Amino acid sequence: MSIVSLLGIEVLNNPAKFTDPYEFEITFECLEPLKEDLEWKLTYVGSSRSLDHDQELDSILVGPVPVGINKFLFQADPPSPELIPASELVSVTVILLSCSYADREFVRVGYYVNNEYDSEELRENPPAKVQVEHVVRNILAEKPRVTRFNIVWDNEDGNADEYPPEQQVDEEEEEEEEEEEEEDDEEEEEEKDVEGEEGEEGEDAEEAAEVEENGSKEASKEEDIEEDIEEDIEEDIEEDIEIEDEEEAKNADQGETPIDKVQS
């Protein structure tokens, strides 16, 4: 649980010239007495491509902090234009207002800042060299991005490593995306299982068809064998009959009959 809660920030001189100081009225609540001061700091992001151009505009120690709701005015100098890449001086950038306790940052507020020329002529036809005196800034104060960090306070035992390093404001969205991805994966696995079952059923059907076909082939083979055996038996019977007929014919030619042979 955070001992210090940020209640509100009001951006005072906005819009303003690029060379004007920054002014913020900050309201926060302290739930318990603090042993150390709070450190507030304002950082200007000079380039979106490198951290080397970031400038710490100012920092202030607030303390001792009484329990309850507190309010103070924070002023910071403007950034040095010579430390900002010329291609990014007249553009959109970010300022970061952060607060730390015992060198541990627990809240950070980011604002978009739009830097542009103060006349339509310069905006349509910007000079080759940036004219800083004609550049104005506009802080999008109505759309701050707040990030909170869990730290160990005076009344808490333990190590800071036991706490998650930070809690992003988009944590819920990331969890929803992860849940959606898991659901998609489960659906894909179910589809694969269904396809696998259908494939197995198809294979079983093919095997059954093959077994049935083989069975019918074997049955037809057995029928053919039986027919061949019957034909052979019929042929043998016909041959025996022909032989008997031939013998009877021979005996008839000799004038003998089976009866005559018996009598003689």
Curated annotation (Swiss-Prot):
UniProtKB keywords: Chaperone, Chromatin regulator, Coiled coil, Nucleus, Transcription, Transcription regulation
GO process terms (BP): cellular response to stress; DNA replication-dependent chromatin assembly; nucleosome assembly; nucleosome disassembly; positive regulation of transcription elongation by RNA polymerase II; protein modification process; silent mating-type cassette heterochromatin formation; subtelomeric heterochromatin formation
Coiled-coil region(s): 165-198, 231-251
Region feature Disordered, mapped onto this chain: 152-264
Biased composition (Acidic residues): 154-213, 223-248
InterPro entries: ASF1-like, ASF1-like_sf, Hist_deposition_Asf1
Molecular function (Gene Ontology), one example: acetyltransferase activator activity
One GO cellular component, as annotated: chromosome, telomeric region
Localization in the cell: Nucleus
Keyword field contains Membrane: no
Main localization, broad class: nucleus
Family statement drawn from the similarity comment of this UniProt entry: Belongs to the ASF1 family.
Record-linked PANTHER family: ANTI-SILENCING PROTEIN 1, HISTONE CHAPERONE ASF1
Function of the protein: Histone chaperone that facilitates histone deposition and histone exchange and removal during nucleosome assembly and disassembly.
Subunit structure of this chain's protein: Interacts with histone H3 and histone H4.
Protein name: Histone chaperone ASF1
